[in-house]
Amino acid sequence: MSDEEHHFESKADAGASKTYPQQAGTIRKNGYIVIKGRPCKVVEVSTSKTGKHGHAKCHFVAIDIFNGKKLEDIVPSSHNCDVPHVNRTDYQLIDISEDGFVSLLTESGNTKDDLRLPTDESLLKQVKDGFQEGKDLVVSVMSAMGEEQINAIKDIGTKN
């Protein structure tokens, strides 16, 4: 037995991985992939034939799902790539704070107050205008690799 103290860093997640491995050759257009540490949606995949030295290669062109930037990567088709766990959840919009955060109602009846307004100008305008007009709005929140962002909005009628 030692007299040393053990310090453990507590983490918010339950240890679930933010990504899972998938063979590059099986990733298709409209699928997801991690490029340069960012979760992306694949917009184009091309495969080169096996050369004199080496494997067939997959050329991925993808768009970052949070900031919209275009990223590219070339991976041997037999190698594994990281694929992000992407979740989409709908919440009802309750309030917009002055500091740019939204208050959302979860399915369980709790509030979620840790999400910022969207950075996309047209989506931001839709959210603000709809809220000011007193509409009942449902926002779609995409989450992947520890990031969350509002990416769509639905009008479910006017508040009574």
Swiss-Prot record:
Cross-referenced PROSITE patterns: IF5A_HYPUSINE
GO biological process, one term: positive regulation of translational elongation
Record PTM Hypusine, positions in chain: 52
Residue numbers spanned by region Disordered: 1-21
Keywords carried by this UniProt record: Hypusine, Initiation factor, Protein biosynthesis
Bias-annotated ranges (Basic and acidic residues): 1-12
UniProt keyword Iron-sulfur present: no
Reported modifications of this chain: Lys-52 undergoes hypusination, a unique post-translational modification that consists in the addition of a butylamino group from spermidine to lysine side chain, leading to the formation of the unusual amino acid hypusine. eIF-5As are the only known proteins to undergo this modification, which is essential for their function.
Domain of life: Eukaryota
Main function: Translation factor that promotes translation elongation and termination, particularly upon ribosome stalling at specific amino acid sequence contexts. Binds between the exit (E) and peptidyl (P) site of the ribosome and promotes rescue of stalled ribosome: specifically required for efficient translation of polyproline-containing peptides as well as other motifs that stall the ribosome. Acts as a ribosome quality control (RQC) cofactor by joining the RQC complex to facilitate peptidyl transfer during CAT tailing step.
Family as reported in the entry's similarity comment: Belongs to the eIF-5A family.
Protein name (database record): Eukaryotic translation initiation factor 5A-3
Species whose genome carries this gene: Solanum tuberosum
Organism classification: Eukaryota, Viridiplantae, Streptophyta, Embryophyta, Tracheophyta
Gene: EIF5A3
